Amino acid sequence: MSSYGGGGYSSRGGGGGYSGGYDRNGGGGGGYSGSNGYSGGGGGYGGGGYGGGGGGYGGGGGGYGGGYGGGGGDRMSNLGAGLQKQNWDLDTLPKFEKSFYQEHPNVAARSQAEVDKFRRDHAMTVAGNNVPSPVETFDEAGFPRYVMDEVKAQGFPAPTAIQSQGWPMALSGRDVVGIAETGSGKTLTYCLPAIVHINAQPLLAPGDGPIVLVLAPTRELAVQIQQEITKFGKSSRIRNTCVYGGVPKGPQTRDLSRGVEVCIATPGRLIDMLESGRTNLRRVTYLVLDEADRMLDMGFEPQIRKIIGQIRPDRQTCMWSATWPKEVRALASDFLTDFIQVNIGSMDLAANHRITQVVEVVNESEKRDKMIKHLEKIMEDKESQNKILIFTGTKRVADEITRFLRQDGWPALSIHGDKQQNERDWVLDQFKTGKSPIMVATDVASRGIDVRNITHVLNYDYPNNSEDYIHRIGRTGRAGAKGTAITFFTTDNSKQARDLVGVLQEAKQHIDPRLAEMVRYGGGGGNSRYGGYRGRGGGGFRGGRSQGANGPNAMPMGNRRW
């Protein structure tokens, strides 16, 4: 077998290839069928609405009934109790290839001083035995033609820092830890070596599970990973599926039974599929843990350990994380062997220095007026294609703010855990494409949602800690761009003042004198249970809870502003 599988990938042709991209979890005719959408309100906002006449958001085989929390149960710690622990005998397991890297002559010719300078210039540190030198161009990475054609078609000028160092590491077959900020290009860092890995393995037989398994903390991130793998794997006819909770299992089960080379999954739904015999992990030889710190934050460690116990121990494992806390280090030491590590940027959690941070000390009653003033300034140039992500502390406040903004004529939509999956997908699409350039979100969106060109983040409510603050504002200023983060800080947040000032000082940002005063004099209050505006439901809000598509996202938009 050649190092890149030779003609292996071409023989993957036949058999139907990739059947339908990530959309195939939909069906026909379901979706959101109401006639609400944006059709009202003086011409409204983009006729047709959400579902309904004129297409709207595509089908869904009867719709996605259960909404968030249905079916998947990703947080149930007793998941996996029925999984049998595997006793692996490596002598009897089929052999497989995982080392494909051949150093390019240009890379081999560079002196250690040149390598060290490149790493310094890109804020890159490495650790471990025999770490390969970074590559500086796509051609130096040594990917086969069928991969490079896809990369060049995307128009990327050069590898990002994490790709420069991560590609040689992953292609070498070694276990890898990569620490880099969200938006650094890490998805491609493991996706492209995964495609090479798959094409060097025997074709799937009936009943085989996937060859590559990617675990992700949220369904939004899982879907985005799937989009990248679909894009770059199509020339190899690599099939994939995305397995996550909150939607019916039928389409996911059908994909798994037909056979997929790549499975992208959230931990809970994957265990559900394993326990029910819908798939197995016996063929997995390339395992990816994406946003490992976030998965541990969300309480998935027991599920991750159960899943890894179902995978042969001589697999290749790649772990990616934005931070490197002791919990992630423990997971790496338990499941990675002689791993090599690359860190981009400081190992300490710090804010992106390309982001201008504006922190305003306000009263709760001032928040809405101040938000509107900021929006007026940001959106006054309609040609600027600004995108604004507004974070709230609760789902209730997210819906109230969205309702308020839409009534005031702003193109705003909300996303949070109580929204049904197809509505969340639709909202994300509207935001990504700029059709609705304002998105209101809870922390479900603070990691894992990869929307490019977000120009502004507005923290309507301050989060529970400075780490979440850094991750929230990190949605802007990505891929070398600049961004602005505006934060409303109240006396209820005073316990967080010292940490916030530390973040601002490290990034050399202006500090509101009232914020500095909170640090000097301490201050009580703690965290308010509800971070948002109290008692102002906004005109026309009948009833106190979001009704999904009949809630704030379905309200006709006033035509006063937009």
Curated annotation (Swiss-Prot):
Its EC number is 3.6.4.13. Keywords: ATP-binding, Cytoplasm, Helicase, Hydrolase, Nonsense-mediated mRNA decay, Nucleotide-binding, Nucleus, Ribosome biogenesis, RNA-binding, rRNA processing. A motif (Q motif) lies at residues 136-164. It holds the Pfam family Helicase_C. InterPro entries: DEAD/DEAH_box_helicase_dom, Helicase_ATP-bd, Helicase_C-like, P-loop_NTPase, RNA-helicase_DEAD-box_CS, RNA_helicase_DEAD_Q_motif. Residues 167-342 form the Helicase ATP-binding domain. It catalyses: ATP + H2O = ADP + phosphate + H(+). It is an enzyme of class 3 (hydrolase). One of its GO terms (biological process) is nuclear-transcribed mRNA catabolic process, nonsense-mediated decay. Belongs to the DEAD box helicase family. DDX5/DBP2 subfamily. Associates with polysomes. This is ATP-dependent RNA helicase DBP2. It comes from Chaetomium globosum (strain ATCC 6205 / CBS 148.51 / DSM 1962 / NBRC 6347 / NRRL 1970) (Soil fungus).
